[in-house]
Amino acid sequence: MHIVQLANFYGPRSGGLRTALNHLGAGYVASGHRVTLVVPGRRYAVESLPTGVCRYSLPALQIPGTGGYRAVDPQRVRAVLRRLEPDRLEVSDRLTLRGMGVWARRNGVPSMVISHERLDRLLEQFLLPGAMARHVADAANRRMAASYDTVVCTTAFAHAEFERIAAPNVRRVPLGVDLATFAPSMRDSGWRRALASGADALIVHCGRLSPEKHVERSVDTVAELTESGARVRLVIAGDGPRRRALERRARGLPVTFLGFLAGRGEVARLLASADVSLAPGPHETFGLAALEALASGTPVVVSASSALREIVRPGCGAAVDDYAPAFASAVTGLLDSPEEIRRAAARARAEEFAWPTSVRGMLAALG
């Protein structure tokens, strides 16, 4: 069958969403399906990816303040869909492309939307008080869920806002991790020594530097550890609109900003070379960067407010409250545990999340 994947907020530096779409598309092709990915771009382009996916880039304006994200006009998407004639429609955008479920139903195309974010959490952080945010999110989610045949949530955390409205068409399908690229064997002791700059422990934060990720908590964690006498260095890999503010916050602390790492191999080498990874974002609905760290044999300290509390288990990391002292205490506890045991536990947990399993689940949801 011909599966068309739709997404805005997809670009060269878009992290987890891009990774998920690429692996799912590759898996669909490997399962014998034709796959077309439609995303925003600077100009119109059609290209065949090495995975066998055909990618359409549609002209789209940049969204101010997002660090380069683009959102294509839904009218352009609908015009392309009419030409592509999909057998199944998979949408990875609940906001700017929320009307695509209606298009699919009118045209007799079975449709699925993947919930990559918690709408109630985002509204509460950026726009509205808690109760009002939930009320607005519930109304929007009812309309959205009713317009698609299936809503896919990757975790219980992501599912919670649909449980609250008793949406009947929700399925749980976890995402996966590339266990070949992200592996303990990628550890580079020489590079680790260079990055650590004399510190006893190398801590890494890998991800987009945007407000909802709360990268400042990683910086503050290192401040807590340094004040307690620990010899640590934090390496932040990623870029985004918060970078300048974070650099100011980190002034005088053992923090290095690497910027965006384009190669997945380079990211894998960094994660495997670290002693601990931090994932302080409280709104993560899955957290691929944290899972990639686990696959690399590196334990992770995560926000207990996020979906990552479902993924990280004792021994391979810790889920803690959203303040720096809790993160610092968890880091200390992990560093005090035997390295070989904690690294083996991290890898073992990641091995429970293989992309082929996720692909099978998504294909079952597509029908």
State each model region's role.
Residues G41, F157, G176:
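Carbohydrate-associated surface elements
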Residues L119, A133-T150:
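Membrane-proximal helix-turn-helix segments that form the acceptor-binding/catalytic region
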Residues A145, F260, R269-A274:
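Short alpha-helical donor nucleotide-sugar binding micro-motif in glycosyltransferases
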Residues A194-A223:
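Conserved donor-binding/catalytic core segment of Leloir-type glycosyltransferases
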Residues P282:
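Aromatic "clamp/platform" in nucleotide-sugar-dependent glycosyltransferases that forms part
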Residues P299-V302:
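Short hydrophobic beta-strand element within catalytic cores of glycosyltransferases
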